[in-house]
Structure formats: C-alpha cells, structure tokens
Amino acid sequence: MILKSILTHLKAVKWGAWSLVCLCLSLVSGILVALHYAPAAPYYSTTAIDLLVPFGQYFRSLHFYSSQLFLLLTIVHLLIAFPGTDSYTSTQWGRLVVALPIMLLLLFTGYVLRSDSTGSSAGFIAESILMTIPLVGAALNNMLFSITEHGMQRVYVTHIITLDLIWLALAWEHLRRYRIRFSDYLPLAGVACLFSVFIAAPLDPEHLGVTYISGPWFFLGLQELLRYLPPSIAGFIFPAIFILALFFMQKRYPFFIQILLLLAIWLFFYLILTLMALYR
C-alpha cells in the first residue's frame, strides 16, 4: 500500500513541465554566458566570466545546474510517463529516443567548452572515440568537435546552435503538448536560482601530478569501460546497444520482455561501472 501511494504521488507530479521550466532557465542563462565566452581563449574566458563579468559566476552556475536538473527531471518524466508511450507511433517514439543522446551531447559539449582539466580531457577522449568509428567517424568529428584542428570553435557552434536545433526539431512535437505558466513553478525556479547563489559551477584547473581526471557524471561508466575495452566498443557500440534497445521499448513488439531485460542488465552494468569510477 505504501509503495502504491508513493507511485500515485509521483505520477501526480508534472515532471515534464518541471523539466521544461529548467530548460527555459538553462536557455536564458546560457545566452547570457555565451555573450561573454571566447572560443579562441576558452579557459581564460570561462575564468573571466566567473571573476570579471558582473554576476557572471552566478549565471554560469545557473546555466550549469538548471541543465543538470533538466536532464534528471527528463529521465524521471520518461520513467513515470513510460506506460503511456504505447500510444505513440514508431516515428514519434523514435524521435524522442534520438533526442535523448542529443540532450546528453548538449550537456557534454558544455563540459568541454569549460576547457578546464575535466573539459579538455573529455573533449580529446570524445574526439578519439569518434575517429575510431568506421566510415562516418572522421566526418562526425569534423562536424561536432575537431578540437585538434579548430580548438573550441567547432564545439562552441555545436553547443549553441547545431545540437539545440536538432534537439528542438526532434522534441518539438512532444514539447508543444505542454502549456506551462511560469508563475505556477516559481518554487522550482526559486530553488534553482537560490542554489546557484551559494554553490558555484565547477571549474577544475590543471593540477601537477594528477593522473586521473573524472569526466561528466553521466559518462563516468563509459570512462571506466574505456579502461578495459577498445574505444570503438566502449565509446560507440556499448552505448549504441542501449539506444537501439530503446527504439523497440514498446509493447507492440513481441520481444518487449527481452528488450526490457536487456535494458535492465545494461543499466545495472553501467551503474556498477559508474560506482567503480566514482571510487577510483
């Protein structure tokens, strides 16, 4: 009874609307940060935003934390609303599935643009992984990253334009179902804004003698797997299995139970890898 009551209360929460509010906060604060960011001197400009631009550190923190909240609330929204996704056509569901890795790439490129020890390492690892993908790897790297040749210029455009437009195109049909009044979600917005006042967004300078650098929290499992498997398997094939399985996560397919089991095993394995990376 207690579990059923908890589930009922969770379903009553408008997780989708909450995530949309966080998306709005992320977009507004991101525009303000982007105005002062210089791809030619990424780490210097990030530091200058924190130290020299009036309220710069606050808006960078708000952009960072509202983006993280957007991802987390979207995941919760997906889990809670999943039983209702059977009404979606394969095309509608497929677009939302593709929107998920695009969302992760948006957050990931945000980490890379900091160009601190975490961002620089993450960027070069991503570039190396893409270059191992047969046929299309070099083209994808040239379109999304190309850090070795162009520094942060390509990543900057990818983060503020390319991925945003792709994600909006994929999710627009779903987003327009929601009509939110920002005034109804002032407590959530207030928490995000207040949290950003007291907790600054991370910025990790280079430290001599440090041999292990943790990447973004949502990619820690992949980072750990790269220690044991080739980049093409750990960085491309392994996550591709999860995305492909999601495509068939609708009850209309006869192998729904098998896909559900595969996803559960994948997530459990990824959780173990993430914990290993956290305690390394």
Summary of predicted features, one role per range:
Residues 1-280:
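Membrane-embedded alpha-helical bundles that constitute the cytochrome b-like, heme-associated redox core
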